[in-house]
C-alpha cells in the first residue's frame, strides 16, 4: 500500500459512474448479460484512463463487474443462498422521520407495496465465483498494464454485510456460525485479490447500528466479533495489502442515526488492515479531532472521505485541502490519503461525480503545497 511520501495521494472507495452503453445493457437484464460482460474489458480500460486523467492515484475498475452492488454481487459467487421475499426492520432513523422516509431508498416502504427480496441462506455457504473474480482481475490487470498508476485496489464485501437483516440465516445454528461461513467462503476472494498484486479493500459499512436499532453495547459486541472473524479470514495476507472501508450507508437521509467514529475506532484499529477509509462529511466533519487523543498505530494510513456521496454540492478545493492538512498535522502527512465517503457511481449524476473528483485532485495539490512547503 502506497503512502503519501512526496504528495497527498488521492483515491476513492469503489463504484464509479458507468458508461451509458453499460447501463443500457444492464437494464435489459439476463438477455443482454453476455453482451454486458463482453463489453467490460474496454469499459475498464476507459475508466482506468479517466481516473488517471482526472488526477486519481489509487484506482480500481469502477466495480463494473459487480452486478448487484457492493454486497449483492456475491449472489452469483456464494452457494447456499436463495433470492426470496424478505421483510426488513424499520431502523431508528426511519422512526424518527417517518413521513420523510416513506418511499425513499433505505426508507419505509409505502403501504401495500410488495416486500423486498433478499439473499436468504438455506444451505452450506461455499465460494463458487472464481470465474467471475478471475474475469474482473484479468480486466483490471490488462487495463493498468498499459496505463501505469500509483496503486490499484479491488473491493470485496465483509462477511457481516452479505445480508444482516433478521431471517437471512435459515441454515446455520447461530449468527456467529453464519458469519464465519461467509468469512471462510469470502476468504478465497480476499486472497485472490491480494495474490493478483492489488490492495484489498474490505467493504464493512456500519449502518447496522441504525438499521437494526442496536444499542451501542450490542453493536460493539457484534463489531468486535466481526474483527476477530475477519482477522482469521485474512490469515497470511499482509496487513499492508489491506484497507478497510467503513461508512453509514449511501442514502440521502438525515444520518442522525449514525455512529460516531470514536465509538468504535478502538475495535477498528485491531483489524489486520493498514488502511482505514471512513466517512468524514457533513455530520462527521468534526471527527478529525478524534486523532488528537487517539494515537494512530505505526503502519496505519487514514483515508478520510473528503467528498460526500449524499449531496450534489461539489466541495471546494480549499475545503478539501483544509480537511487533509488539519488531519495530516495530527497523524503525519505520509499517513493521509484523500478519499470519498462511499462510492459516487450510481448515487450522483456522472457530471457531478467527476466534478467532485476534479475538485479532490485540486484540493490534494493545495494540501501538498502546504504540507511540503512546495
Question: Residue locations for each model-derived region?
Answer:
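Domain-level signal for soluble alpha/beta catalytic cores
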Residues: 1-374
Amino acid at each position: 500500500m502506497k503512502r503519501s511520501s512526496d504528495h497527498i495521494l488521492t483515491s476513492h472507495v469503489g463504484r464509479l459512474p458507468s458508461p451509458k452503453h453499460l447501463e443500457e445493457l444492464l437494464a435489459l437484464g439476463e438477455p443482454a448479460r453476455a453482451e454486458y460482460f463482453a463489453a467490460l474489458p474496454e469499459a475498464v480500460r476507459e475508466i482506468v484512463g479517466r481516473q488517471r486523467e482526472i488526477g486519481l492515484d489509487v484506482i480500481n475498475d469502477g466495480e463494473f463487474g459487480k452486478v448487484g452492488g457492493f454486497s449483492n454481487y456475491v449472489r452469483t459467487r456464494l452457494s447456499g443462498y436463495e433470492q426470496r421475499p424478505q421483510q426488513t426492520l424499520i431502523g431508528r432513523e426511519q422512526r424518527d422521520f417517518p413521513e420523510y422516509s416513506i418511499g425513499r431508498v433505505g426508507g419505509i416502504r409505502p403501504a401495500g407495496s410488495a416486500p423486498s427480496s433478499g439473499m436468504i441462506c438455506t444451505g452450506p455457504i461455499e465460494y463458487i465465483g472464481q470465474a467471475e473474480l478471475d474475469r474482473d482481475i484479468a480486466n483490471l490487470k490488462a487495463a493498468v498494464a498499459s496505463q501505469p498508476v500509483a496503486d490499484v485496489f479491488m473491493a470485496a464485501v465483509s462477511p457481516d454485510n452479505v445480508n444482516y437483516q433478521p431471517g437471512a440465516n435459515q441454515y446455520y445454528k447461530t449468527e456467529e456460525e453464519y458469519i464465519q461461513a461467509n468469512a471462510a467462503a469470502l476468504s478465497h476472494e480476499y486472497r485472490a485479490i491480494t495474490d493478483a498484486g492489488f490492495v484489498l479493500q474490505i467493504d464493512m459499512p456500519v449502518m447496522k447500528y441504525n438499521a437494526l436499532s442496536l444499542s451501542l453495547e450490542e453493536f460493539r459486541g457484534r463489531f468486535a466479533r466481526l474483527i476477530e472473524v475477519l482477522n482469521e479470514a485474512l490469515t497470511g495476507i499482509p496487513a499492508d495489502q489491506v484497507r478497510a472501508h467503513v461508512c453509514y450507508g449511501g442514502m440521502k437521509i438525515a444520518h442522525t442515526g449514525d455512529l460516531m467514529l470514536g465509538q468504535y475506532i478502538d475495535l477498528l484499529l485491531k483489524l489486520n488492515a493498514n488502511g482505514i477509509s471512513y466517512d468524514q462529511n457533513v455530520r462527521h466533519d468534526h471527527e478529525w479531532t478524534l486523532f488528537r487523543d487517539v494515537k494512530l498505530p505505526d503502519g496505519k494510513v487514514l483515508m478520510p472521505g473528503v467528498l460526500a456521496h449524499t449531496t450534489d454540492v461539489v466541495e471546494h478545493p480549499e475545503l478539501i485541502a483544509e480537511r487533509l492538512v488539519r488531519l495530516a498535522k495530527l497523524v503525519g502527512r505520509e499517513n493521509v490519503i484523500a478519499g470519498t465517503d462511499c462510492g459516487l457511481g450510481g448515487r450522483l449524476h456522472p457530471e457531478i461525480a467527476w466534478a467532485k473528483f476534479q475538485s479532490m485532485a485540486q484540493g490534494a495539490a493545495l494540501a501538498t503545497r502546504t504540507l511540503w512547503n512546495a
